[in-house]
Amino acid sequence: MADNDNEDIIMDDLVEEYVETEEENFVDSEEESEDKDEIVESPSICEGFVQASSQTLVIIPDNERITSNVLTTFEATRLVAVRAQQLAINGSTMLKKKYSSPIDIAKQELFNRKIPLLVMRCIKVTPEGQKIVEIWNPREMGIPLLD
């Protein structure tokens, strides 16, 4: 997805979505996020929220991850829903083939490993208020079948 000057942020209890940059540089840093697993496009997107809360976010390096590299059905469904919502409001597709609905496009992007989103999994929250998370790219994860 190309850079967009006016980055739209849609937030609810589970999701923060952002415009993806072409480079995906994962840097260990302290950032803040929601309490549940989230879908994000870049770890750096949380930096703006650090000042708004006393809680900080610690990202586990890729080589020290402890959770499974398989998407849960919930995560896969949520990825499709968020991406379909982006496409429904005139987001650009990552596919060359034409599909009839945003949901079909989002499913195909996920299964073709072209979906421009990341999954943030919360590992634990420390007594000091630090949230320890892993950030996964769905392109490197196993994908469950969705009906």
UniProtKB/Swiss-Prot annotation:
Molecular-function annotations in GO: DNA binding; DNA-directed RNA polymerase activity
UniProt keywords, alphabetically: DNA-directed RNA polymerase, Host cytoplasm, Transcription, Viral transcription, Virion
Location(s), subcellular: Host cytoplasm; Virion
GO CC entries: DNA-directed RNA polymerase complex; host cell cytoplasm; virion component
One GO BP annotation of this record: transcription by RNA polymerase I
PROSITE patterns (UniProt xref): RNA_POL_K_14KD
PANTHER family registered for this protein in UniProt: DNA-DIRECTED RNA POLYMERASE SUBUNIT K, DNA-DIRECTED RNA POLYMERASES I, II, AND III SUBUNIT RPABC2
Subunit structure: Part of the viral DNA-directed RNA polymerase that consists of 8 polII-like subunits (RPB1, RPB2, RPB3, RPB5, RPB6, RPB7, RPB9, RPB10), a capping enzyme and a termination factor.
Family the entry assigns: Belongs to the archaeal RpoK/eukaryotic RPB6 RNA polymerase subunit family.
Function comment: Component of the DNA-directed RNA polymerase (RNAP) that catalyzes the transcription in the cytoplasm of viral DNA into RNA using the four ribonucleoside triphosphates as substrates.
Name this protein carries in UniProt: DNA-directed RNA polymerase RPB6 homolog
Organism encoding this protein: African swine fever virus (strain Badajoz 1971 Vero-adapted)
